[in-house]
Amino acid sequence: WLMIIEQKCNIIVMLAECVEAGKPKCHKYWPNDNMEETYGIVSVTNKEEIKYCGFTRRILLVSAKLKDGSVLTTVTQYHFTKWPDHGVPQTTSAIIRMHREIMKANKDLIGQSPIVV
């Protein structure tokens, strides 16, 4: 989360599930819907979670008290949920729709910020 704040990232893209084929693949780094979690000096609140066919969009409010002041920013996470444990998705429609939404959201942001994948 400190990297997200430092680099002023507004979009995170996640292409994997946390557990695939019964094995952990990724640590869940966000709180459940309408919940807050603290990760070190960073607090993350899941303000909104919208499930689409093939992906979930989460609006995360990220805050931290740093040496040089407090930071409060909004980060949107796009979580692709249709990738099978092995192989590739049967169709590309869900990932293309998610990609289009990410590109539109990034274009609408003021200033440039890297997208974290």
Swiss-Prot record:
InterPro entries: Prot-tyrosine_phosphatase-like, Protein-Tyr_Phosphatase, PTP_cat
Tyrosine-protein phosphatase domain: residues covered: 1-117
GO molecular function, one term: protein tyrosine phosphatase activity
Enzyme class: hydrolase
UniProtKB keywords: Hydrolase, Protein phosphatase
Catalysed reaction equations from the record: O-phospho-L-tyrosyl-[protein] + H2O = L-tyrosyl-[protein] + phosphate
The EC number(s) this enzyme carries: 3.1.3.48
Pfam families: Y_phosphatase (PF00102)
UniProt binding sites for substrate: D85
Membership in a protein family: Belongs to the protein-tyrosine phosphatase family.
Name of the molecule in the record: Tyrosine-protein phosphatase 25
